[in-house]
Amino acid sequence: LLLKVKKENGFCEIYYLQAPVLADLLLILQSRMAVIFQRLENQGEAYKDELITYNEALVANIPQVETAEIQQPSPERRIMSITLKPGETQSTLILVFQDEQISTLCIDDLQIEALIIGIQQALKTVGDQELVQYLSSNMDFLMCYTVDLTTQPNIDYQQYPQEDWKLNLFSHYLGVLYCCETDEGKKIVSGAVVKTSAPHLSELENNVVTRIIEKSPKLKAMHAELAPCQIFSTIIPSQPGRMLSLEECLRPLHAFYLEKKAELSA
C-alpha cells in the first residue's frame, strides 16, 4: 500500500506498507473506530457533526498520487515495523523504515474513518483476494500459545511472541481445547491460548476458535486427519494492560483441560 500524507505546511510524505505492516495499521485503525463509536454514543450529534465537517475538509485536501510514486517506490520509504503509542484522541505511530531511520506519524481520531475507507477502496481496486483474506484473518485475535496434549504428563507447546502494544488492543485471553473422536472415544488432543475481543461464547468467538488451527502449522499438522468434534473455551483472567506470562497462560489452560477431561470420562 502507498500512503501519501499531506502535512499542515503543504509538504507531502510517502510511506510504503507491505502486508504484515498494513495488517498492523488496520488493527490500530479498527481499535480506534471502537473508541469513536463509543464517543458517538456518548456525545451524539455534536460529535457526528464534527466528524462530517472534518471529513469534508480532509477530502478537499487529498494529495495527488503521481504515477512514478506507484511504479518506482523508494525502498527507503518502506515501513518495516509500526509501534503504537495511544493517546486520548489520536494515535502516534513510531515507524521504522527499511534504512533503519525512525519517524513518527500522528493520526487523529477524526481521520480514522476516511483512512479506513481509502484502504478498503485501494484493496477493492487491486482485487487481490489472497491479500484481503490475509488481512481479515489478522484482525480479530492474536496467537499466544499452541499446545500438544497427547504428550502428557509433559506439555509440548509453541509460543507466538507478540508485541505488548498489539496485545493491548484486545480485551481478554482465551483458552481453547480441541476434542476429537479417537479409537478410544472422545479425547482432548490439543489446545491454544489467544487474545481476542470477541464476546465469550458468541458467534464471533466461535469463528475465532475454528480458525486458530489454520493459523498454526503445529495444530494444522495434528488435525490433518483428526478434525475436532468438539471445541471448549474459557476466559483466562487477566488485568487490563498486563501481559500474562507463559505459566499464567498454560497453567489455567491445563486446569481447564483436567476439568473437561474429567467431564468426558464421567
What are these regions, as identified by a protein language model?
Residues 1-266:
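Positively charged, low-complexity terminal tracts
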